[in-house]
Amino acid sequence: AELMERGETVYDINCVACHQTEGQGIAGIFPALAGSDIALYEKDKHIEILMEGVSGAAMNSFDYLSEVELAAVITYTRQAWGNAEKGDGEIVIPKDIVDYKEPKI
């Protein structure tokens, strides 16, 4: 519950302008997060997008956020707007972000 509250706050500050209050995005410009395959199922891809941004798109990297903030906002978007019921509802913990940052061998 605390992760969700923190995630909603991080979302409201960093994400809402493009992805909108209900995660619906803006058609043709900013993708919806509500019902998105990435938010429903692809946890690792979800982490990668926030860490790296999306080349050629308006989505910048948010790697300046703390591990806790990143885990919270990713969990929030995976749980909010009916996503938990439609998808795997998998939560992201700060360790997932730390693990992502580890050098890949």
Residue ranges and their predicted role:
Residues 1, 63, 67-68, 72-105:
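Flexible coil segments in periplasmic/lumen-exposed cytochrome c-class electron-transfer proteins
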Residues 22-25, 88-89:
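Short, surface-exposed helix-loop/turn micro-motifs enriched in polar/charged residues
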Residues 1-10, 25:
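Electrostatic cytochrome c docking/interface patches
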Residues 7-21, 73, 77:
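The canonical Cys-X-X-Cys-His
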Residues 22, 54, 80-84:
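A general structural signal marking secondary-structure boundaries and capping sites
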Residues 24-64:
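Gly/Gly-Pro-rich "capping" loops immediately C-terminal to redox-active cysteine motifs
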